[in-house]
């Protein structure tokens, strides 16, 4: 895959099953995926190989939204997700590919994310910053051990 890319790596204090579920549950995804200052609406989500999803991020200040969707290319429960993203806005052309790898480690899950094919009009550092913010929210969702 060509184009701009970001690579992220984290260790989360949660088992791979919980981290994987945060990527394939619409309610969970809406809670953690939008970066700071945005809300997310999951319009549909069919987490299976060949399945599709559609979501929108809305800027809380301006109320402007941008929508995107994609297709699930590969899913290995608790280990791997590979999917595409394509913006509805014609000014954001191309297809982005995202690979999420999960590995059980002694203290939880090692998470690696590669996002490739980012459109040239989107600064890569802004993508990276957005992912960093989202991953903080992901940790806040999956790390607590709440019994009940």
What are these regions (language model features)?
Residues 3-9, 16, 40, 52, ...:
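Intrinsic-disorder/low-complexity, polar/charged segments enriched in Ser/Thr/Lys/Arg/Asp/Glu/Gln
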Residues 41-84:
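Glycine-rich portal/gate segments that line the openings of hydrophobic small-molecule binding cavities
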Residues 2-4, 47, 62-66, 90-94:
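A generic structural micro-feature
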Residues 1-39:
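Hydrophobic ligand-binding cavity/cleft-lining segments
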Residues 19, 29, 53, 72, ...:
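Hydrophobic pocket/interface hotspot
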């Amino acid at each position: 895959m060509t184009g701009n890319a970001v690579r992220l790596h984290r260790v989360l204090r949660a088992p791979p099953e919980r981290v994987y579920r945060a990527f394939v549950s619409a309610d969970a995804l809406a809670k953690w995926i939008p970066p700071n200052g945005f809300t997310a609406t999951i319009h549909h989500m069919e987490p299976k190989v060949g399945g599709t999803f559609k979501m929108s991020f809305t800027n809380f200040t301006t109320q402007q939204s941008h929508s995107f969707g994609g297709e699930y290319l590969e899913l290995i429960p608790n280990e791997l997700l590979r999917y595409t993203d394509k913006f509805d806005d014609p000014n954001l052309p191309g297809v982005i590919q995202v690979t999420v790898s999960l590995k059980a480690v002694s203290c939880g899950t090692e998470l690696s994310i590669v996002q490739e094919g980012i459109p040239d009009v989107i600064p890569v550092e802004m993508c990276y910053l957005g992912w960093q913010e989202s991953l903080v929210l992901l940790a806040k969702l999956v790390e607590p051990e709440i019994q009940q």
